[in-house]
């Protein structure tokens, strides 16, 4: 029952996010299409937060020899992959709306696809191995590789941190509110995945 509650709260939070995104402040050059940029940015930041949290939980799991933390690492890694994969269609939608086309050779987009494929393969390996300590190692390695590669991926069409560089406090406030809602959704999804993993032991 508790596991189902977490899933329903996750789905409810997604609905709140969808509704909230409709009320984002317009921007001078992009108009109301900037609302896609808000959700697109908050979504991928949430994925990065999840991968980072999975790595931290993994490190702490190794240091403290904690099975519980290894399980959290697994759940956070899976939740992060959900946000990362679903970010891809959001990215395409944002491209089409704001750039009037799909620039599939954009380095940031190719990077996102590459790490989506790698993430899926690694999560499959985690499910096959069923070794909590290996799960944490994989999540630590994945996050390190992702962060290293992201820092070195060039930007062509993709602007560098458009929200943080904005002069509008209203835009920044709305974005971080939306990000908070996405992280809230991440929490419920991670909790559901953790409970599911514990039940399957």
Summary of predicted features, one role per range:
Residues 1-201:
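Polytopic transmembrane helical bundles with strong interfacial aromatic enrichment
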């Amino acid at each position: 029952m508790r596991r189902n509650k977490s899933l329903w709260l996750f789905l409810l939070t997604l609905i709140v996010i969808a509704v909230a995104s409709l009320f984002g402040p317009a921007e001078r050059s992009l108009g109301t299409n900037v609302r896609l940029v808000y959700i697109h940015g908050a979504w991928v930041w949430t994925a990065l937060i999840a991968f980072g949290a999975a790595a931290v939980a993994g490190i702490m799991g190794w240091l403290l020899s904690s099975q519980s933390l290894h399980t959290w690492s697994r759940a956070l890694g899976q939740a992060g992959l959900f946000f990362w994969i679903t970010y891809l269609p959001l990215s395409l939608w944002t491209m089409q709306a704001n750039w009037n086309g799909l620039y599939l050779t954009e380095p940031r987009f190719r990077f996102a696809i590459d790490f989506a494929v790698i993430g899926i393969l690694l999560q499959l390996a985690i499910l096959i191995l069923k070794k909590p300590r290996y799960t944490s190692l994989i999540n630590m390695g994945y996050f390190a590789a992702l962060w290293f590669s992201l820092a070195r991926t060039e930007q062509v069409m993709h602007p560098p941190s458009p929200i943080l560089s904005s002069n509008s406090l209203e835009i920044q406030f709305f974005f971080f509110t939306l990000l908070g809602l996405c992280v809230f959704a991440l929490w419920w999804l991670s909790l559901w995945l953790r409970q599911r993993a514990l039940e399957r032991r």
